[in-house]
């Protein structure tokens, strides 16, 4: 900004020339025109003692000079003159202005406001029933600078529906259209500014802060808004207090010291200070004097650029200062404009021409800015000069400039102006102008602004940081905010080159949630999330359970998908059972092969011949049924498992039952009866018994499948990390009834052979059958408690094992001994050993008798 730098030097040179010389700056604060705009600017301030000692409603002297207020007033002058010199907005018309000093005091501001509301051509306000045709001295008012003053003037001007456009008042309450129907502003409301502040705190993880506000409407409302926004974002306010305005009384001093003590006790490193410049001046004065440890101060816009605060001695001791200022367009010619008018103020000829015009308002109001006419270099802070030279005050200057253009645009719309002229029928009244300002858009340099329904404009913010390059700070832009915060970390200066930490408790590790201690949510212990839950967000207070189809280990930040679990073919237990299947199936096939090879031998014939082979085939099918249990279950496999296992077993046990019945008959009945019954047990009737038993078992299986069909179930509760898919048995009682046929056959076999006495010199067939049935019962009786206690995932493996062990037991106890005789004891493979002498004789007699009868018949 070279032009602004030149302006700063020119201003300094002018002020040096102005030492001891009388200037005429105050006389430049009024200009005539077709329409007059009022202006309220903080050109000075008063001593607090003067207000305390005031006992009569007389004038209040403004003893201090405010350079910033002077620059803002000159920005309004420049905007008015720019509009008058152009033809884009008000061709053929001139705007005038009447600027007054608010002295930063409500009492002084009220007096100026009353002068604006006085009837044109007079200095008084008359009482009327209807003010519709009332013509005040000014058409609209620019200002004031502070929300405290705007709350007062806003109600004054709203009664007359006079448009008021503030360039700095940002209280959110001023957006209330019922109370302030004629109030507008060219800055965003404090709510937007505080949203930016909360975003800044979140960005640096500053969740343990103090919040202080000035003891006035501005500070109290700001604290209220900040508190609600901070709570919604998980930021804890360790201490919240109000700072009294600057006062030398002992009572006020005690309040300030109490605020400082409580901030120290809260052990915060960041303080949000939403206060007026006077309150901040009071707080920082005592903070520096009493040696408060440096903090990070997040400033409100009202004091971030205040020369009252920036020129405080030893201000650098307070620490780091950050704050947001609304962004505006640059006005590069403003430096030249200020330089020119300051030079004119020192020109005696120019001042003499102004003195020739009598200012009637000065008889009532007094001189507009007494301190402006005798300012000297020491009246202007070096920090303000540096910031102005660097273009750091352009946001406030532009806001004033834009406020003037908003009124000019509204007047342009009201008068229906075009590029050549305006339709001037009669003088425009303030309420007529106001009608055209609602939701109006207007141009100010490169920006297009628009008033919303609440009279606010939407503008971006610049994040400013105080940088100590001299006894007073200089503002540096270190970020922007337009709904999202963008920081320039390389431009930020921190003590020790480390970002301060302001947290009550450390950040929890991954997979941990917060358990609050006390009243503040930011003070907490970290608790691990248990298995099956996870931490969804870093600020969570409870662990979030995983979905049904997910799982998580302890201290998780996310859930993992559950893998399906079933008895897979590749599992070791399945592979072991498949090896056992091969063994049992191999033995059954070997026994079947030997039986077929020795089909005519007494051993095979005594064992039932075809029934013996049929039993071996059924035993093999019984073993093969285990192949239905491994793998991912399906509806078909679940339905087929029990029938495919029990029907072959019924066929096998029915043949063994016939063997047991024949053994019992031969041993316990007379020979004639025994021979007669044995002929039936070895003929067609024997197959009818097998068919009947199989039919009964098939009927039971059909009833089981129809009444209680097993189904594929997805079980989420059995395994912590997997989802179990298995065949669900809907009724264990019905499944037990499916076993009833086989159990009855086995019991009858055991009963028929256990009591039979063996005959000397004969093969003890009853012993093999007894042990075979014992193997059956031991297997399935052991199966019940084992199945009840094993995990559901491995219940199919238990059923597979029971089937194979049962088949192996029958093979080992009944079939393999016969194979042993066929292979290694062929001398015992005789009719006498397997059938006995009586049986052989009876067989021969039956054979001879049959032949004689046949010959007789022939």
From Swiss-Prot:
Q: Which residues lie on this side of the membrane: Extracellular?
A: 21-572, 632-644, 709-735, 789-796
Q: Which UniProt keywords apply?
A: Cell membrane, G-protein coupled receptor, Glycoprotein, Membrane, Receptor, Sensory transduction, Signal, Taste, Transducer, Transmembrane, Transmembrane helix
Q: How does it sit in the membrane?
A: Multi-pass membrane protein
Topology, Cytoplasmic side:
594-610, 666-687, 757-767, 818-858
Any GO BP annotation = G protein-coupled receptor signaling pathway
- Result of changing residue 55 to A: In strain: 129/J, 129/SvEv, AKR/J, BALB/c, C3H/HeJ, DBA/2J and DBA/2J
Give a short account of its post-translational modification: The addition of even a short carbohydrate group at Asn-58 is predicted to disrupt one of the contact surfaces required for stability of a dimer.
Subcellular localization is given as: Cell membrane
User: Which first-to-last residue range defines the signal peptide?
Assistant: 1-20
Q: Name the tissues where it is expressed.
A: Expressed in circumvallate, foliate and fungiform taste papillae as well as in taste buds on the palate. Also expressed in testis. Not expressed in brain, heart, kidney, liver or spleen. The topographic distribution in various taste papillae is different from those of other T1R members.
Phenotype upon changing residue 706 to N:
In strain: SWR/J
- Return one GO MF term: G protein-coupled receptor activity
Glycosylated where?
58, 85, 130, 203, 264, 379, 387, 418, 439, 482
Q: Which domain of life is it from?
A: Eukaryota
Its cellular-component GO annotations read: Golgi apparatus; plasma membrane; sweet taste receptor complex
InterPro entries, sorted? ANF_lig-bd_rcpt (IPR001828), GPCR_3 (IPR000337), GPCR_3_9-Cys_dom (IPR011500), GPCR_3_9-Cys_sf (IPR038550), GPCR_3_C (IPR017978), GPCR_3_Ca_sens_rcpt-rel (IPR000068), GPCR_3_CS (IPR017979), Peripla_BP_I (IPR028082)
Q: What does this protein do?
A: Putative taste receptor. TAS1R1/TAS1R3 responds to the umami taste stimulus (the taste of monosodium glutamate) and also to most of the 20 standard L-amino acids, but not to their D-enantiomers or other compounds. TAS1R2/TAS1R3 recognizes diverse natural and synthetic sweeteners. TAS1R3 is essential for the recognition and response to the disaccharide trehalose. Sequence differences within and between species can significantly influence the selectivity and specificity of taste responses.
Q: Describe its partners and assembly state.
A: Forms homodimers or heterodimers with TAS1R1 and TAS1R2.
Q: Which family does it belong to?
A: Belongs to the G-protein coupled receptor 3 family. TAS1R subfamily.
Name of the protein in question: Taste receptor type 1 member 3
